[in-house]
């Protein structure tokens, strides 16, 4: 039993799931929302999703608790999650890990506060700065010149940022990056705490760290104050479900208030029960599962590197600082040596081989391995990559390689987003201050954020990424032929 818990916690239980099954057997007559009334009002939807699914798509009620103010089965599920993940508190989130990340930032920061963070963060972090008015203090990461990817934050960079900005309220860390790169989280937590700052971890891609021997340290084990954990990415829950974990020194009641500022009052029981069931699964079998996932990824790395022309990178990148550790479950592959951009290999895999990988960028692809993968699918991916090399290999002249461009920050994201602005053709924006986001999605790391100066290098990158077929989002103009820039600001 957790300290202060009124429930006898048992990781074999899934209280939300069990309550829904009990509710289903009661055959309650619904005169509440949702209006499909257990699927009867929308037979096409019921046929598509199944009666069992729509039958538990229900509203909050006494026997099922309320996500905004949980006191029974949801509260117990949250305490079970906290126990399983080694946290003081856990919150079930139904707005994706975007909502978890934004809650962390909004909990730590008020308007005018400074927050230390790497620039290669997910858009949700910078969106939170637009909402709360906090000021980013960027620690620009090193770049691996061969791979063109940004690495982790070096300890001396974080220490320097803390000394130069002693009034900053928090340090935010990616654990890991999309490519599997980990910073020295324990050291950064200690530096932040010694300076009286919170340490926040974006663990959207690190759920398995809590259940895997030989994997990088989890945020809670490292002593971080808050962590946003994307259960649906590698933990098996439904898309859009997430966990927010907090340490013992974070006021859980205040965090709940922050969550309720933006989270829906109609929390999906499909999402919540998927978190509940998936937590139980990981608590019971997580270590075994992720050991198998790691073995599959290591096997795939060896096979892909044996093809020639590809570089499936791994633990050899670890240098004790900017790459303090590496997540071996991430199957990231450099493709430029076969003359193809990552996004081109991504498209070929989908269009020619019916294989959907997570993303392709300028120089790399990522195949996401998790609890649902099997050896035969890995073999199919390896075979497809070998055939792509044989069929499509070129000399690669004219390919860009760099994924990260240091930003020139002129004003805060909030001030820039809400400032007077005008729309200019893309090439006429050079030297201006951007008032909107521009990013390839996935991974959703902004090329430009509000308040940053637009340079010729950035414009070249945008045009190149568009030409290669990257899915670009953010600006008002969906074709990204124009950008909004601040008026009267150079």
For each of these PLM feature ranges, what is it?
Residues 92, 138-140, 229, 359, ...:
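Structural signal for conserved beta-strand scaffold positions within catalytic alpha/beta enzyme cores
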Residues 1-72, 443:
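N-terminal "arm"/small-domain region of PLP-dependent enzymes with the aminotransferase-like
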Residues 54-96:
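Conserved N-terminal alpha-helix of the aminotransferase class I/II PLP-enzyme fold
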Residues 38, 178, 233-234, 249-251, ...:
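Short, glycine-/Ser/Thr-/acidic-enriched flexible segments
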């Amino acid at each position: 039993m957790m300290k202060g818990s009124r429930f006898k916690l048992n990781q074999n239980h899934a209280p939300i799931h069990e309550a829904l099954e009990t509710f289903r057997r009661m055959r309650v007559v619904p005169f509440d929302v949702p209006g499909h009334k257990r699927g009867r009002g929308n037979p096409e939807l019921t046929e598509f999703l199944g009666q069992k699914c729509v039958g538990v798509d229900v509203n909050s009620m006494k026997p099922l608790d309320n996500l905004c103010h949980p006191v029974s089965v949801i509260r117990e599920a949250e305490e079970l999650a906290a126990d399983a993940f080694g946290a003081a508190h856990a919150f079930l989130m139904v707005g994706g890990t975007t909502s978890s990340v934004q809650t962390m930032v909004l909990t730590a920061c008020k308007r005018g506060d400074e927050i230390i963070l790497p620039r290669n963060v997910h858009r949700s972090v910078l969106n939170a700065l637009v909402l709360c008015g906090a000021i980013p203090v960027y620690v620009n990461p090193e770049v691996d010149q061969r791979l063109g990817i940004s690495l982790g934050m070096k300890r001396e960079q974080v220490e320097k940022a803390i000394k130069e900005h002693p009034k900053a309220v928090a340090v935010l860390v990616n654990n890991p990056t999309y490519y599997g790169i980990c910073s020295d989280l324990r050291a950064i937590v200690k530096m932040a705490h010694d300076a009286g700052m919170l340490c926040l971890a974006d663990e959207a891609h690190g759920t398995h760290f809590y259940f895997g021997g030989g994997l990088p340290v989890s945020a809670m084990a490292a002593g971080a104050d808050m962590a946003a954990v994307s259960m649906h990415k590698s933990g098996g829950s439904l898309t859009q479900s997430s966990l927010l974990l907090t340490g013992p020194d974070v006021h859980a009641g205040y965090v709940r208030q922050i969550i309720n500022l933006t989270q829906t009052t109609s929390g999906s029981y499909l999402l919540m029960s998927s978190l509940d069931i998936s937590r139980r699964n990981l608590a019971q079998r997580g270590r075994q599962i992720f050991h198998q996932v790691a073995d599959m990824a290591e096997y795939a790395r060896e096979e892909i590197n044996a093809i020639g022309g590809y570089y499936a990178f791994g633990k050899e990148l670890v240098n004790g600082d900017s790459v303090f550790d590496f997540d071996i479950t991430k199957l990231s592959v450099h493709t430029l040596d076969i003359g193809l951009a990552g996004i081109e290999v991504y498209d070929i895999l989908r269009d020619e081989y019916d294989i959907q990988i997570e993303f392709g960028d300028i120089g790399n692809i990522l195949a996401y391995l998790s609890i649902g993968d099997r050896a035969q699918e890995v073999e199919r991916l390896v075979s497809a990559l070998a055939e792509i090399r044989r069929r499509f290999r070129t000399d690669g002249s004219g390919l860009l390689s760099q994924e990260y461009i240091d930003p020139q920050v002129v004003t805060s994201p909030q001030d820039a987003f809400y400032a007077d602005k005008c729309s200019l053709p893309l090439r006429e924006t050079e030297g201006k201050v951007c008032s909107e986001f521009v990013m390839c999605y996935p991974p959703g790391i902004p090329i430009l954020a509000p308040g940053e100066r637009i340079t010729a290098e950035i414009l070249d990158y945008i045009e190149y990424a568009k030409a290669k077929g990257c899915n670009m989002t953010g600006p008002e103009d969906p074709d990204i032929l124009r950008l909004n820039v601040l008026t009267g600001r150079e």
